[in-house]
């Protein structure tokens, strides 16, 4: 199977965020291809390598949790947005901001044109990205996350309006990463890129749909080890960005 981490993430999400190995194995058999004779051991190995609770953790992706070793009960590691993540209608995106023609208010409003992208909907979650060409240190980086709370069409005399088809999203549940993820600290393969460089990784319109395992990777890496947020401290960080 090509993407074990993504498949296991999908299985746990469909199971309500948590499942025993005895429940995971049948789903792997259904979704997997060319599993091989040792597929159960491979399943456990992929869970362990992507879980900081385990001695076998790779030290990079941290998307699964095992609260009690030997229990066989695995769950998604959701530092935030658990309710939204478990809603199977929620999709996940990387939204690029900070462009030269900057119409957005980070952590408040995000603007785009539906003629170029019409995938994002209310309730979706996203990771914020600053592109390399406008970054002060000449590296792109991920600096926060949020939820698309509602959509509205801007008035033609507002700063958000430029052309027919423009639409705005109001952002809720903003999270400012205490640990921004810089280009130098990750590799294309961390986001399942097939190239050695970052060329073609992100779309030209600044809105890239990603799988849940990639969203959790970036969210958990950016938020660090904390499981609960100090709302006042997070609000200060978001406004200071």
Show the residue positions of the predicted features.
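Short beta-strand-centered aromatic/proline hotspots
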Residues: 138-152
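Contiguous surface segments at macromolecular interaction interfaces
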Residues: 76-88, 99-102, 114, 153-241
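Short beta-turn/strand-loop junction motif enriched in small, turn-promoting residues
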Residues: 33, 130-135, 153
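Short, basic/aromatic beta-hairpin or loop at an interaction surface
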Residues: 91-107
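Flexible coil/turn residues that form the inter-helical turn or adjacent wing/linker of helix-turn-helix
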Residues: 17
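Phospho-regulated, low-complexity intrinsically disordered regions of nuclear gene-regulatory
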Residues: 1-14, 22, 29-89
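Short coil-to-beta transition motif at edge beta-strands of beta-rich domains
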Residues: 118-134
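Short alpha-helix capping/helix-loop boundary micro-motifs
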Residues: 108-116
